A protein has these predicted regions:
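Phosphate-group recognition and catalysis centered on beta-loop-alpha active-site segments
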Residues: 1-189
Length: 189
């Protein structure tokens, strides 16, 4: 185990030195980002330089031709689905998801990543996606291992979803641990 820690430390130091050297020796123009072919642009919580999870952010993502838009989904006490990262307490919190879907439906090349903050939204979300004919362009993220059963038991059971799971960087060298991860993936779909 000690050798893994030493390796991790040396790798971290090398990365820091490399980034620092790059930042110091390159001019601003040389440091501009360039994207490789088939790079996907995702508008996280809407779009850069807008307030998260707002209709303004959705409009900006559409205007900038984002290929995927990520929206955090929660439910108001009155059962309205809204875009919100934070817990929704009142019936005025968050922008209504239905308003965002009305904008997105006319953008046929945009996929939608719904970050599920609470599983009670799943059946209502599915109904909205069917109503707006967006089911085939949508997928779920933010799914914790303990929430997989709720997804599988919901109307969203046939949608693609991505599991939130952070495997150990150090245990990954163990065959037993890798088998545990494979089993977890099999069990969660």
């Amino acid at each position: 185990h000690f050798s893994y820690q030493v390796f991790a430390l040396l790798t971290s130091v090398a990365m820091i030195v490399g980034v620092a050297d790059y930042a110091v020796t390159k001019s601003y123009d040389e440091r501009k980002l360039s994207f490789m072919d088939d790079f996907t642009i995702t508008a996280h919580t809407g779009a850069y330089d807008t307030e998260m999870n707002t209709l303004e952010a959705v409009k900006a993502a559409i205007k900038n031709n984002a290929e995927i838009i990520e929206l955090d989904i929660r439910q108001r006490p009155d059962k309205t689905l809204v875009m919100s990262h934070d817990i929704v307490v009142t019936n005025n919190d968050g922008a209504p998801l239905e308003d965002a879907l009305a904008l997105i439906k006319d953008t046929p090349d945009m996929q939608i990543n719904f970050d599920i903050k609470e599983t009670r939204v799943l059946n209502s979300l599915h109904a909205l996606l069917v109503d707006y004919n967006l089911l085939d362009r949508s997928f779920l993220t933010g799914i914790e291992v303990i929430n997989v059963k709720a997804v599988k038991d919901s109307n969203c059971a046939n949608m693609d979803y991505y599991l939130n799971y952070k495997p150990s960087k150090f245990k990954a060298f163990s065959d037993d641990y890798r088998q545990k991860i494979i089993k977890l993936l099999e069990d969660t779909g």
